[in-house]
Amino acid sequence: MEDVEARFAHLLLPIRDLTRNWEVDVAAQLGEYLEELDQICISFDKGKTTMNFIEAALLIQGSACVYSKKVEYLYSLVYQALDFISGKKQAKQLSSTPEDGTIGDASSRAPQEAEQKFRALDDLSDSCANVDLRDDQVVSGTLIPLLPNALVAPDEMEKNSNPLYSCQGEVLASRKDFRVNTCTPHPRGTFLLEPLGVSLMEALQPWNPKEPGRAEEQPMEVSVCGSPGPALSTSQEPGSSPEGPVPRGGGVGEDEEDAEGAAEPPEASAPEVPMEPPEPRSPEQSVAQPRRYTLRERKEAPEPASRLKDTPDPWQGLDPFDSPDSKPFRKGRPYSVPPRVEEAPGQKRKRKGAVKLQDFHQWYLAAYADHTDSRRSRRKGPSFADMEVLYWKHVKEQLETLRKMQRREAAERWLPRAEQGLWPVEEDRLEDSVEDLGAADDFLEPEEYAEPEGAEPGEDADMEAEAMPASLRYEELVQRNVELFVTASKQDVFVTTSRQELVQETELKQHIRGWEDAIQSLLQEQEEHVPFDIHTYGDQVVSRFSQLNQWCPFAKLVAGQPAFEVCRSMLASLQLANDYTVEITQQPGLEAAVDTMSLRLLTHQRARQRFQTYAAPSTVQP
């Protein structure tokens, strides 16, 4: 066994050296380090100020809480201000637009605002007989109403339960985002946040006789003449009943006179007087007042059960398997274009006849325009797709023909057409188009192709013809016009582009442009700097010391250098202090220690040189 160990001793030696290097009691060293940290006390100003990390942490936490509360309070104040502004605007809009639609002056608007500010609660049907009110009762606290469930923001799980997808598969919204799914619908069409407010809203809603929906609920009576009118009741004297005996007489003639008097409209008998709430009066005053007619209040008649059954529920779900009601067949009116107005697309292979197609405009004016003959009924205009396509197709052709005619008239003033014989084929086309346009003067609007007012046709062409010599040939004339056109187009494009740039140049873009200019200059300056090598700058700092163990201020070492060079020298000095090449010191005190850094050179040997010549214990020969 000893021979085997001696044989492989050179292989076991590196492993033993490696295990010897790792035989370190980490737990003991960590315990000693924690004990030293527990005994260390950080103080400033020669022990006057002691650093307590627990108090500092609590102070930072409290400051963060205070500032967060301030931010939340400011957030709520902003929302309150927005609600106040929106409510003020709504109040102004309501006060400026009365019910009758007329806009009054400021003097008449003030009492309306005062009336609309508070709602009268005298028309509530609840009895208040058993309620005792105490003046000296102390209010225990302010009751905050709960937020309705419809206004509570849903969580992420509720939002993702039934999402609404688009055609491309994107999530557009959730089911809770629509009020129709979170609120309770009222029969009048209002969405209520809670169903508890239905009866209260009906009780608070005033009765308006002008409302069209309540017209049929007003009690009506039929007079003798057969015309319906509102039910009237007479104010009787005290002690007399409305169902008392009929007064004297009672003949047929008197009844007819009473019927004629009742049939007269109220406007003819007495002027209109605005209704006012009755005031409490004494019996003597009521006896002295003459008898007057007033509207008698009647209870609303309940709707018959048959009408309630016939009215469908708009919110009731439909049965997908229910057979729909059969609707009667309605015969439609066919529309067709005459065969001689447009060529049929399916007759290419057939032999065409010698029949000439009828002009579309002549047929259209004869069929749909106004007729002088009143005995012939006027047809309706084009109302189907094929007719619309054909109509606008011919309109575009006519407009294009008119533009060609105007250009030709302008060119005829300085181009002799008869001598040079230009455009022989187009002449025939224009002549045919002019003949067709003769019957369609009222078919096209002249404003679409007319020249601006104050400018005679061909005025620009006359000026150009006067400036041109008579010896120019047609080719030279065309080249000159093309060059002028290209030059003018370039100028127009340049002017348009510059205008668009000026319009789009906003204040934000100006700030961005200034920031880009500043950043570009800084980046260019950074690119010109020499690459940073901490060892090179460390050698420069060491070379500035004249001898060992001599204190030298850092400001003296970096005097006259730019800011980025000072920063690099500072980093190199810290690295030298970490390698125990130099020693750093400063004056005591917080404020007094500013800019008092001094260095002392300990050795000329570099730490990187020691690492370069370092050899592991295992590699060293014993």
From Swiss-Prot:
Record's keyword terms, sorted: DNA condensation, Nucleus, Phosphoprotein
Chain intervals with Basic and acidic residues compositional bias: 294-312
Phosphoserine modifications at: S95, S199, S223, S227, S282
InterPro entries associated with the record: CNDH2_C (IPR031737), H2_M (IPR031719), H2_N (IPR009378), Ncaph2 (IPR031739)
Binding partners and assembly: Component of the condensin-2 complex, which contains the SMC2 and SMC4 heterodimer, and three non SMC subunits, NCAPG2, NCAPH2 and NCAPD3 that probably regulate the complex.
The keyword Lipid metabolism is annotated on this UniProt entry: no
Family according to the record: Belongs to the CND2 H2 (condensin-2 subunit 2) family.
Protein name from the UniProt record: Condensin-2 complex subunit H2
Role, per record: Regulatory subunit of the condensin-2 complex, a complex that seems to provide chromosomes with an additional level of organization and rigidity and in establishing mitotic chromosome architecture. May promote the resolution of double-strand DNA catenanes (intertwines) between sister chromatids. Condensin-mediated compaction likely increases tension in catenated sister chromatids, providing directionality for type II topoisomerase-mediated strand exchanges toward chromatid decatenation. Required for decatenation of chromatin bridges at anaphase.
Residues bearing PTM Phosphothreonine: T19
Domain of life: Eukaryota
GO cellular component term of the entry, any: nucleus
Cellular compartment(s): Nucleus
Positions of region (Disordered): 207-354
A single GO BP: positive regulation of chromosome separation
GO molecular function, one term: chromatin binding
Bias (Low complexity): 262-273
PANTHER family in alphabetical order: CONDENSIN-2 COMPLEX SUBUNIT H2
